[in-house]
Amino acid sequence: MAPEDTNPQSSHRRTRSTSRSRPTTPLRPSSRSSFRSSARGSVYGDNAAFPLNAFEPAFAELADAVADLEANMMHFQLMHESLARFSESFASFLYGLNMNAFCVDFPEGPITESFKRMKLKEEEMQASSQIPSAWRGDPPISTPTAIYPRTDIRILIVKSGGYTWWKRRASWGSG
């Protein structure tokens, strides 16, 4: 066994560090003394009938800590099961959205029926308000307004009833 250092200055130097990376936390009362010192006291005349009785408080504390750990792990298990159920349900929802995207055609712009519905709605609004279209300030449906020579894509801008539609067309014929 190595001799213990009884110099108070050396132990004082060790505990007094000026560059601590994190704050220190005081130890719990049972952790301040080691098992060795408690066993030494019982062996060398602590008036105990059985020397291992000195470990009884430490083992009781260990049993309590293990019971707390078991309860916390049970809570973790419940949380894991809840998250797994949610993840499975959410994955099913995303899969349904993905399959819906494959089964339903989403056009990039309005289709012919959209223009027909808009025209009917506009006629209904005009009939109900009896205001001439020239007074409303809506421009008529325009012709292709932009030509991109490198990509040969033309854009049709349609203003009708407060909505603006952009439609990409790859070919318009001669325009």
UniProtKB/Swiss-Prot annotation:
Single GO biological process annotation from the record: attachment of mitotic spindle microtubules to kinetochore
UniProt-annotated stretches for the region Disordered: 1-39
Main location: nucleus
Cellular localization per UniProt: Chromosome, Centromere, Kinetochore; Cytoplasm, Cytoskeleton, Spindle; Nucleus
UniProt-listed InterPro entries: DASH_Dam1
Gene Ontology cellular component terms for the protein in this record: cytoplasm; DASH complex; kinetochore; mitotic spindle; mitotic spindle polar microtubule; mitotic spindle pole body
Keywords: Centromere, Chromosome, Chromosome partition, Cytoplasm, Cytoskeleton, Kinetochore, Microtubule, Nucleus
Keyword presence, Cytoplasm: yes
Low complexity bias: start-end ranges: 20-39
Main function: Component of the DASH complex that connects microtubules with kinetochores and couples microtubule depolymerisation to chromosome movement; it is involved in retrieving kinetochores to the spindle poles before their re-orientation on the spindle in early mitosis and allows microtubule depolymerization to pull chromosomes apart and resist detachment during anaphase.
Stated family: Belongs to the DASH complex DAM1 family.
Complex formation: Component of the DASH complex consisting of ASK1, DAD1, DAD2, DAD3, DAD4, DAM1, DUO1, HSK3, SPC19 and SPC34, with a stoichiometry of one copy of each subunit per complex. Multiple DASH complexes oligomerize to form a ring that encircles spindle microtubules and organizes the rod-like NDC80 complexes of the outer kinetochore. DASH complex oligomerization strengthens microtubule attachments. On cytoplasmic microtubules, DASH complexes appear to form patches instead of rings.
Designated name of the protein: DASH complex subunit DAM1
Source organism of the structure: Chaetomium thermophilum (strain DSM 1495 / CBS 144.50 / IMI 039719)
Lineage, broadest ranks: Eukaryota, Fungi, Dikarya, Ascomycota, Pezizomycotina
The gene coding this protein: DAM1
